[in-house]
Amino acid sequence: MAVGSEEHSLESLGILKKLAANDRPTREAGISALETYLESSQDISQLDFLKVWKGLYYCMWMTDRPKAQRDMALKLPSLLLVADDANATKFVETFWATICREWNNIDVLRVDKFYLLIRWFVHMMFRRLSQSDWELSLVEKWTDILTKYPLNSTNASIPDGIRYHMIDIYIDELERAVNGSETTEANKSSTTTTETTDEDKNSSECRCDFPIAEILRPFESLARDGKSQVVKRRAIAEVLNDSRLKSMWQYSAPQIKPPRDVGNKPAKKRVRI
């Protein structure tokens, strides 16, 4: 942080303390203050972003009612849209570091809202990259982060539950971000209509002005080098061989031969959130 800016740091402004507050209004005030801080393009350290995500994780943990959970799962990833490239990259990396570290501590009653948080975060990652005109250097930094954390092919400490969820949602959220859709699969039930309009049909036209090969690189690495045969098969079948890659973007992913089935039963596919 620049010299003389200590009086305007996250801690001095009380933002981190607000995020960890016991009452919801104070936590929400902390989120609003963080958004304003990000908009100001103040330089934030990696360590401070880890503290930020510790607080934001707590905000999500403490949110119980279904509508409030949906709102919070959208609000937190939306902070990406107001950050500059440098802060956005640190925001992305510390989110995934936090989620991968805390995942095994999330109980069954709370896991669905964190699945929804991940879905919205992936969506907002693509939206933010679109805002930057899919600048290749930024895309590469973010795919490196995905390869290091949720889609790491060799780190056994990363739960497969995160990998399965990423396989489930990745192409869906890429499609919605590219087509400009504001609605995720999980939030369709809360919209006023689900009819397909002419505008929706037009939005499905092919757009190939983004580096799709680089965006898919983490899954190619996972499919080639992953330790779990089930994860590798699903990465190939549900991401790299997704028909939308060809039909919408005229892209053919490298052909990776699925591992032989040696008798392991595939994991039962979880209902999408």
Name each model feature, range by range:
Residues A2-L19, N152-S153, S157-I158, H165, ...:
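Eukaryotic acidic, Ser/Thr-rich intrinsically disordered low-complexity regions
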Residues L76-K188, F210:
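Eukaryote-skewed repeat-based solenoidal scaffolds used as protein-protein interaction platforms
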Residues M1-K75, L79-V82, V108-R110, W249-Q255, ...:
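Long, low-complexity, highly charged intrinsically disordered regions
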Residues G4, L19-I31, S45, F49, ...:
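Helix-start/N-cap signature of alpha-helical segments
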Residues E7-L16, D43-C59, A88-I99, M125-T147, ...:
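HEAT/HEAT-like alpha-solenoid repeats
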